[in-house]
Regions:
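Sec-dependent N-terminal signal peptides
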Residues: 4-13
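N-terminal, motif-rich segments that launch catalysis or mediate targeting to/interaction with membranes
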Residues: 15-132, 136, 152-235, 241-245, ...
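Catalytic Zn2+-binding segment of zinc metalloproteases
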Residues: 141-156
Length: 322
């Protein structure tokens, strides 16, 4: 398992990751069909705030860490890992063993497990369980969109680029979020085979790795070591972090790569929620006890979402001060 991930969760770095998860979870609500979207909007504060719960669990649950990634290039999967890893979990266990899969990552299993529980909760009108599993599912699906969740070189530690993980998924979004276009014009799509689709997402993420590592090398070379890094005192230790100048330059070097992946992630989260609702028979109980005022507020906020003004109007919950 990844001890680094536990360090990030317990320390200062994870708070930046929280921003991205909360933002993506909120954005996933707006494109949903009106009835389902209204249900999630009525419970928006919970959905957004609990989007980070799987990361928080890492502190106390030793089984949690491996649920957030799949190191596709691990030796156990062989050179043809892009095509050879079975999507069916039982077949994967038979081929590699459960211990090997747990070591290299279980995010496909966790997505499918939580998805099935969400479908069950929708079918049986288990309101609280729907919200619980929807929040968790959104987190795991979003994590699968992060390239560094698909490789043994998950923090650049194998290529002398340590710190890449938090740089890509946290520091750049935190620095540049206000410049992002948060509206995505596509409606949620029904996912007929979630088990296969999550592997498609992971392969997309994995294909982004070369560009990321190359960009880090080029920006560091252009700025020089002194402008690329700073020494910071954290928890009684002096540690090296990327400078603000480097973070901006790296984000600029990648162009729309990070914001596009973030918005694509929110669309896929929305699609997983929608598909679970459809697989449960599109239950109508989701519209129970929702006021006319809440419906009007949802429609008004969707207008702000479409005009990319959630930040300027103060509606993006992840930016609210506690």
């Amino acid at each position: 398992m990844r001890k680094l991930s536990l360090v990030l969760v317990c320390g200062f770095l994870v708070s930046w990751g929280f921003l991205a998860h909360k933002t993506l979870q909120q954005l996933a609500i707006y494109p949903l069909p009106s009835d389902l979207g209204l249900f999630f909007y009525a419970n928006q504060d919970y959905i957004v705030e609990q989007s980070i719960r799987p990361d928080v669990r890492r502190k106390d649950d030793k089984t949690e860490d491996s649920k957030h990634y799949l190191d596709m290039d691990a030796a156990v999967f062989g050179p043809n890992y892009r095509t050879d890893i079975p999507h069916d979990f039982k077949q994967a266990v038979a081929k590699y063993s459960f211990d090997s899969l747990r070591k290299e990552g279980l995010v496909p299993l966790e997505v499918n497990r939580v998805y099935a529980r969400l479908v069950h909760a929708f079918k049986n009108e288990m309101r609280d369980s729907v919200l619980f599993y929807a929040a968790d599912l959104g987190h795991y699906v979003a994590d699968a969109h992060v390239p560094l969740h698909t490789t043994k070189n998950h923090d650049g530690q194998l290529t002398n680029q340590k710190g890449m993980h938090v740089l890509w998924e946290s520091l750049v979004p935190e620095a540049q979020l206000k410049n992002y276009t948060l509206f995505y014009p596509k409606v949620p799509e029904y996912i007929a085979k979630p088990q296969d689709f999550i592997f498609q997402i992971l392969l997309e993420s994995h294909a982004m790795l070369p560009e990321m590592f190359k960009a880090e090398t080029e920006v560091r070379k252009a700025l020089g070591e002194e402008k690329s890094f700073k020494m910071v005192e954290r928890y009684g230790k002096t540690q090296r972090y990327y400078t603000d100048e480097f973070i901006q330059a790296f984000g600029d070097k990648l162009g729309t790569s990070i914001p596009n992946r973030m918005i694509q992630s929110s669309h896929r989260v929305s699609s997983f929620w929608y598909s679970a609702w459809k697989d449960a028979g599109s239950p109508t109980w989701v519209t129970k006890d929702i006021s006319l005022e809440k419906k009007a507020a949802f429609e008004a906020e969707k207008v702000q979402w479409r005009s990319n003004s959630l930040i300027s109007t103060g509606k993006l919950i992840s930016l609210h001060k506690k």
